[in-house]
Amino acid sequence: LADVLRWRWQAARQGLPRPPVEPIPTQPADLPFLHANRGPAQQPAVTWIGHATVLAQLGGLNLLTDPIFSTRASPVSFAGPRRAQPPGVALTELPPIDAVLVSHNHYDHLDLPSCRALAAQPGGGPLFVVPLGLADWFRRRGIARVVELDWWQHTPLDGVEITLVPAQHWSARGLNDRLKTLWGGFAVFAPDCQLFFAGDTGYSRDFA
């Protein structure tokens, strides 16, 4: 608490740097590669799309973490934190997604419009892998292909094992649901590659 108060005092006294007016330069994604990189000949690849949204291609699958493609991370479209940078890959430019890994329910990691668009992708929606307590939230919003995990539980998907691992964080989407659902990171084990996605976390003994 003392550190937080000191940081707030320093911010009030010294001010905070303003975000850049112009977008930060980006490296355009190789969209033909992303779409062709699938199946037995797939090369392990990770593409950072923005914030916590990452396209991970491994084990012949396309996995997407914490998808947020909306302009704001908020329960409403006209107010709330606004993204400073467009997504590096547009939602409509993504290759077919096999699974979506959601680390927790904060608005900057769980964006309903993005999830609904992914669930409606041509050829069938992906599997949504979520922490304990979140599956019902998805089902009540029309997204039925969902599995929820406790810490250290895993689910197999076409030869790839997806495990929810602990993180030092919390959950809430409103005033009355704080800590009502779990949060975490993901460890993904494929024959050709292993991936760790932390979600949101502070440093804790979970990393020991």
Where are these regions (language model features)?
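Binuclear metal-ion centers of metallo-dependent hydrolases, dominated by the metallo-beta-lactamase
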Residues: 127, 139-158
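Active-site environment of divalent metal-dependent phosphoester hydrolases
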Residues: 106-110, 135-138, 153-156, 170-172, ...
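Metallo-beta-lactamase
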Residues: 1-93, 188-199
